[in-house]
Curated annotation (Swiss-Prot):
UniProt xrefs under NCBIfam families: mscL (TIGR00220)
SUPFAM superfamilies: Gated mechanosensitive channel
Superkingdom assignment: Bacteria
Protein name per Swiss-Prot or TrEMBL: Large-conductance mechanosensitive channel
Transmembrane segments: 14-34, 86-106
GO molecular function, one term: mechanosensitive monoatomic ion channel activity
GO cellular component: plasma membrane
Claim: Repeat is one of the keywords in the record: no
Subcellular location: Cell membrane
Function of the protein: Channel that opens in response to stretch forces in the membrane lipid bilayer. May participate in the regulation of osmotic pressure changes within the cell.
Keywords, in A-Z order: Cell membrane, Ion channel, Ion transport, Membrane, Transmembrane, Transmembrane helix, Transport
Organism the protein comes from: Dehalococcoides mccartyi (strain CBDB1)
Stored InterPro entries: Mechanosensitive_channel_CS, MS_channel, MSC/AndL, MscL_channel
Lipid bilayer topology: Multi-pass membrane protein
């Protein structure tokens, strides 16, 4: 049983999947840091010192009454909130990740496939057959007589 499991794990596609998941998680962490630490602070500064992580709407106050200075204070007080700032961060994070995957993975693969397809279209298929000029059936290229209509070929 262990031997079968070892064979399964060592298959190429399982290892490739594991590597893809690890690299994808690392890439997601990089994009998340890019959005949170590099892009959002200048955008927040341009909009008047807005911290998108602290944009929220209080639906129900917690044990300690509001107004709450930050999302963390509201959550600590037990307030029920809609965290639309966190959602905006996640949305920007997703858009950047989707654009990166499109431009660095999907688009190059599509271009490679199109290039491969155009190479196949340019190279004519070499065949060892020809059409009989009398009955229009496929016959061997070296045939001197058609086996179907028995016509003499030149």
């Amino acid at each position: 049983m262990f031997k079968e499991f070892k064979i399964f794990i060592m298959r190429g596609n399982v290892v490739d999947l594991a590597v893809g998941i690890v690299i994808g998680a690392a890439f997601g962490a990089i994009v998340n840091s890019l959005v949170k630490d590099v892009l959002m602070p200048p955008i927040g500064l341009l909009l008047g010192n807005v911290d998108f992580g602290n944009l929220f709407i209080v639906l129900k106050e917690g044990a300690i009454g509001g107004p709450y200075e930050s999302l963390l204070v509201a959550q600590t007080a037990g307030a029920v909130t809609i965290n639309y700032g966190v959602f905006i961060n996640a949305l920007i994070n997703f858009l950047i990740l989707a654009m990166a995957i499109f431009f660095f993975v999907v688009r190059p693969l599509n271009q490679l496939a199109a290039r491969q397809k155009s190479k196949e279209a340019v190279i004519p298929a070499q065949t060892d057959k020809k059409d009989c000029p009398y009955c229009d059936t496929q016959i061997p290229l070296k045939a001197s007589k058609c086996p179907y209509c028995t016509s003499e070929l030149m």
